[in-house]
């Protein structure tokens, strides 16, 4: 959606559809219910990760906010829903805006001022900020793992927060500045692709460097004839880096799949290959991604998976059902044993009577 205010444009990653109010109301209720379940899974995911610490504190400082920032995205979505249902009413019709970007002036919302649109613009900024926080945040984590591999001699025992704080400040500066540049149309749709085009190759190179470096360390640790001495903390650091790679590989695959589906959907909508209604599915690939990413993270680490089964509602229900089945099976076995004992006693009694 693009808003034209005099000679300035505001670019929002928001869509408004040509749909009846009743349909929008029902759809919004379904979306809100889905977001509530998603929020529960995400909160449980963060709780388990913080409770059972499997990685270095610096990695936690960088990674946990990437999960938690989903709530920022949903705040932006809730603001959009409020405008769609006219709970927040700017005093004029917003119209239909399905395309993510357009150069056609007739397809832009023309207004004289931002009065009544302040929250909508803020919600759009939150969504832009979320997207670029993920992009630059993943690169920051990759850099942190490179540092952990290079400084393997004493990184595990290092308690200073300089590295994660520095990476957080840099990534947030880039995220906020890029989001504002897109929001106020200081860059076009082509330049908007540069952050992920640049970050993805660098993250991939960091991934392969960390993988090769730590696999080499692992082979050296297992070699009984090695000359280099690895302390317990260094051996732990190598194992941690490899665990992080395994987890990161699965998460990146899931996230890239969601991004690819969103990209394909947006392209199909831009060229009118699919009906506008499908845009609901396309944008919810982004809003509902914790269903896949959080469960992938939890089930990639056995300790987290076991804890999830213990504390989650689904896990408790399955546990109660399993205990009930086991109890019923035990009762059946007990009854069967008792019946067999009775039949055996009766048999021997009849056998004894036949000898009389």
From Swiss-Prot:
One BP annotation, GO: sensory perception of chemical stimulus
Gene Ontology, cellular component aspect: membrane
The organism's place on the tree of life at top rank: Eukaryota
Pfam families: Sre
Subcellular location: Membrane
Protein keywords: Membrane, Transmembrane, Transmembrane helix
Family statement drawn from the similarity comment of this UniProt entry: Belongs to the nematode receptor-like protein sre family.
Protein's name in the database: Serpentine receptor class epsilon-29
Organism name: Caenorhabditis elegans
